[in-house]
Amino acid sequence: MTRPVRSLREAASFVDRVGIALVFPRDGIPLPSLWEAVAGDQQVEWVIEKEDGTKDFSPEMERVWSWKDELPAQKRACAGKHLRGWATLVSLKVLPSLYALTGLHAREDGFRQTELSSLEREVAEAVLVLGPLSSPELRQAIGCEDTARVNRALDLLQRKLVLTKAGTVTQGQGWPAGTYDVLARRYKLGRLPDEEVARLDIARIINAPDAPTLARTTGWNKREAARIFGALA
């Protein structure tokens, strides 16, 4: 029986041990998840019903929901929609390899060399100049009231590893809002590995059973996934 993760320190150690983890599991994706690490081998509900009939997070879900934000806030792991747009946790030891696949320079303004939409560039520049911002703060900073468009730009910038989660900020009402920072500023990436070496590193961490699963997990095209999978055999 696997001992469940019970503290933020253990959650950080879990991410360091596996290299890349999803926050929640996905069918057909061989990566471990923080949820599974917290729940352990038991069948655990995400939501519980209280005596008054209202529903709330289970203790396990409370931990996952808090730690997914506390880990990046304390820089114990990189967090964001960095893999296929899924909420992902990346060990800081693995981050240089994942970042190397973007082709970006490891400096805070490295995104200026890549192709971005006008809104993506505006969002990235605002975060670069003003520091970590939430979506509402970003909308105010760039003068765009379209929540869906700004959130879409944030999602795409995370997938491109331009922006990353930096924690949360309390709002006047409702849930705390996630904040975002420039990834290459928030974390010291050092000297990036060669792209081919980085691709092999990421494939080893994923440890997919076959090339199609590797392609599905990474978003690489089928030919590239087959080539890398073959190189690992």
Would you name each region that the model predicts?
Residues 1-233:
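Long, low-complexity intrinsically disordered regions
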